[in-house]
From Swiss-Prot:
Has bacteriolytic activity against Gram-positive bacteria. Plays a role in defense against bacterial pathogens. Involved in pharyngeal grinder function by enabling proper lysis of ingested bacteria. It comes from Caenorhabditis elegans. The gene is ilys-3. Belongs to the glycosyl hydrolase 22 family. Type-I lysozyme subfamily. Residues 19-138 form the I-type lysozyme domain. This is Invertebrate-type lysozyme 3. One of its GO terms (biological process) is defense response to Gram-positive bacterium. It is found in: Late endosome lumen; Recycling endosome lumen; Lysosome lumen; Secreted. Pfam families: Destabilase.
Amino acid sequence: MFVKSLVFLTIAVAYASADCLHCICMRESGCKPIGCNMDVGSLSCGYYQIKLPYYEDCGQPTKKSGETTEAAWKRCANDLSCATTCVENYYNRYKSQCAGTGQGACEVMARNHNGGPQGCKHSGTLGYWNGIKSCCGCS
């Protein structure tokens, strides 16, 4: 019984995460590869409107040998699979900074995506979170 419960919980978390990611993607770009746009003084690119420092923090997924970080960032941001991996990596890197806040995984993911490594602690990310929450019903 314990194993069945654990499997169910794992599947439920995966779906919640997928719903959360989809809503962030929809909020940022309509979930389309929209290229780069100026946002708060720097470029944000692709499906999740990822900035260069965010790409660096997420571990630079799919960066090729000899490729500049800027070229890899723009390419990754406009590839849904790579960009999603980047958002997941960023969440996993910084979620511990939100421990003890009582926030669910989607809230931490959304608010940190919007406000940086400690976005979960900034009131300025609440409006963004409320939009994501109304999309997915996540917590």
